[in-house]
Amino acid sequence: QTSELTGYIAITNIKVKVPVKAGFDINPNGTVAVAADKFGLIETQASTYQIENLSTTELTVKISKVAVSGGVNLVTSEPSDQPTDAKKLMFAIKKAGVVPALATAGDWMTAGAKDYYLDASGAPLALKAKGDADGGDKVNMKLYGITKSGWTNGATFSVTPTFTIAVK
């Protein structure tokens, strides 16, 4: 007599390296340029803002919530230099090489709970298993930001994304 045994994979934990803190400098008086090497008005940023999959299974990553502090107001259209637009900020986090479009509101973050994707696919980004030969187990990210009026030199604010990472 035979007996078939069926195994079910039950992944109960994952290991991921996520950036806890990073800084950037933004110049409201600069010239707005958004391209692979132009980050709006952000002049300097962390060189390694990266998520790394340390698990043996593939994962997905997205941003599911964004919080702000320091009086900043996240918007999805380019702020003017008028006082009515004081401390308005267009802000995006994208996979390196993916550029947000100025005219595409969905490319820019808003505060609160909303799914936000690191590339243009409209879906969570796939991270290959640890040790992927092509580096697909890591995603390098770049920050894009545009702000104009309402700031003093040395002022600070925070944008805090919540990364949701799941088994693929």
State where each predicted segment sits.
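Proline-rich low-complexity regions
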Residues: 1, 17-21
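C-terminal, structured domain-capping segment
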Residues: 1-10, 43, 49-56, 114-168
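Surface-exposed interaction patch
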Residues: 3-10, 23-114
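Proline/serine/threonine-rich low-complexity linkers at boundaries of modular beta-sandwich domains
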Residues: 8-18
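Solvent-exposed, flexible loop/coil residues
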Residues: 20, 24, 28-30, 122, ...
